[in-house]
Amino acid sequence: MPLLDSFKVDHTRMYAPAVRVAKTMTTPKGDTITVFDLRFCVPNKEILPEKGIHTLEHLFAGFMRDHLNGNGVEIIDISPMGCRTGFYMSLIGTPSEQQVADTWLASMQDVLTVQDQSKIPELNEYQCGTYLMHSLAEAQQIAQNVLARKVAVNKNEELTLDEGLLNA
């Protein structure tokens, strides 16, 4: 099985919260797709709570689109990582890491303005696979943490995993 790009970076050297360009690719029609690693937690030291990450998934996707879409950028998807340390964001375009970081901070501020769990989008059994597994309080605590710590940039050239550690 081929080694995925996300497993070629040294997770012991990642900062969090931090933005990283995980991958770029060009479609046959010439559009650039960029995948960002939005790392909320330091790998193997912190983890996002399951209800909080789920609620954040519902809120974050809309807020990020509100702030970032336009001027040649369109978000395709924002999905939580299986390890629960962050999200992957795939988009058409090439916004800078700083632009993404600023958008992320603005989105976290938006999360704090949600006043009631009933205001979480798509929070019903028809649109959500585990609609009872939510916590606005946990999502807002995650947002507070990001705002307090700010968002750094993780550079791939600083995180390249030593070949000797592959499959260690």
Swiss-Prot record:
Record field: catalytic activity: S-(5-deoxy-D-ribos-5-yl)-L-homocysteine = (S)-4,5-dihydroxypentane-2,3-dione + L-homocysteine
Gene expressing this chain: luxS
Native organism: Neisseria meningitidis serogroup C (strain 053442)
GO biological process, any: quorum sensing
Amino acids binding Fe cation: H54, H58, C128
Name assigned to this protein: S-ribosylhomocysteine lyase
Reported cofactor(s): Fe cation
Origin: domain of life: Bacteria
InterPro entries: LuxS_sf, Metalloenz_LuxS/M16, S-ribosylhomocysteinase
EC number from the UniProt entry: 4.4.1.21
Enzyme class: lyase
GO MF: iron ion binding; S-ribosylhomocysteine lyase activity
Pfam hit, one: LuxS
Record's subunit section: Homodimer.
Family of this protein: Belongs to the LuxS family.
Known function: Involved in the synthesis of autoinducer 2 (AI-2) which is secreted by bacteria and is used to communicate both the cell density and the metabolic potential of the environment. The regulation of gene expression in response to changes in cell density is called quorum sensing. Catalyzes the transformation of S-ribosylhomocysteine (RHC) to homocysteine (HC) and 4,5-dihydroxy-2,3-pentadione (DPD).
Span of the signal peptide: none
Cofactor note: Binds 1 Fe cation per subunit.
PANTHER family according to UniProt: S-RIBOSYLHOMOCYSTEINE LYASE
Keywords: Autoinducer synthesis, Iron, Lyase, Metal-binding, Quorum sensing
Coiled-coil spans in chain: none
